Amino acid sequence: MTHIVCPHCQAVNRARDERSADKPNCGKCHQPLFDGPVALTAATFDAQVNRGDLPVLVDFWAPWCGPCQMMAPHYEQAAASLEPAVRVAKVDTESEPDLGARYNIRSIPTLALFRNGREVARQAGAMGAGDIVRWVRAQL
């Protein structure tokens, strides 16, 4: 069994490993558990990173950042390849400066990979979809 945190209501769902690829819905709010990158806030970050069993890939970005805007569609494509094995998320460092400070984000875009509540890898700079997927899989 894998524990998956709902990106909509933050409820923890149990899913059989062999069924997690079947586009599961939340048992509480009935929304899809995987639907592309999840926008995280200070209120939802810890639940996604600490309460589920999945590794969490976070893109720390800002709306004014040109490379961030260029990477956004590639990040969406990478999410389609990585889900449901990895929770793919984004943090807008303009809206959530405390999260950027908490993780000492010095340049954007920065990708951080979390596993079991701890950061296990970090990569700064814009990347293409294939590079993102390869980098994440190399870390796991």
Model-assigned labels for residue ranges:
Residues C6-C9, C26-C29:
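Short cysteine-rich clusters marking metal-coordination/redox-active sites
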Residues N13, P32-L33, A72:
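Cys/His-rich microdomains that often coordinate metals
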Residues A15-P24:
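Short linker/helix segments within small regulatory modules
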Residues D17, S107, A112-L140:
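Non-catalytic, surface beta->alpha helical segment in thiol-disulfide oxidoreductase systems
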Residues C29-V38:
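Short Cys/His-rich micro-motifs in 6-15 aa windows
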Residues V38-V56:
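A short beta-strand-turn-helix
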Residues D53, F60-W64, S107:
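Short pre-active-site segment immediately N-terminal to redox-active cysteine/selenocysteine motifs
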Residues P67-L82:
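Typically the conserved alpha-helix immediately C-terminal to a functionally engaged Cys/Sec
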